[in-house]
């Protein structure tokens, strides 16, 4: 009897990617939620698990492969006077005991993602603007208005930190308001200060400061204003600058604090500043 020889066939398992046990990612940053006139940042950072990368293009495709599982994908851009650790942003302190009011434009994105083995994943990081611009304009009236040499101030209740994963604000701080005189345009003669803030926090926001005059005959005038109600919505709608203006009569006697009560929201006005 002839011997019968049987040959067995082994079928190779087929995979969809060169990394069957892990997953890859491609992340595209969406910068469309920017305020008017704000440029797309030159670079941005991405953190996911034990991976950290920096990108200058719109899309980041790292060589790094990820184990299957759930991750938090965090993206942000470097911004002047803001440091980021995890999902916490902190504002730089200044020598006068305040925090910086000259922040760069910070954008962030946080999302939970799931990585599957043997799969290439494509994600979009919708970058949200986290810094809002605030402008205060004081229109001076009264006999001493033309003698005003300078206006200085501080705004309290400003957020020194923010957790952009939970949208919570902390570290109540003050920011300096450096008013400059407008020399042309609709508000010529008024004094204005512009700051960029992460947000507000704490129970109240108070403006304090002083008006100084040319010459030695008139002492400086303290100024004060409770801004709490006016700034209650500052942490929302960051892409739209907030501009507030008021009329303030210069006091005619020494030792009187000029209290500002009636602020009004104003449209953005182009002006030349001295």
Where are these regions (language model features)?
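Bacterial Sec-dependent N-terminal signal peptides
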Residues: 2-32, 264-274
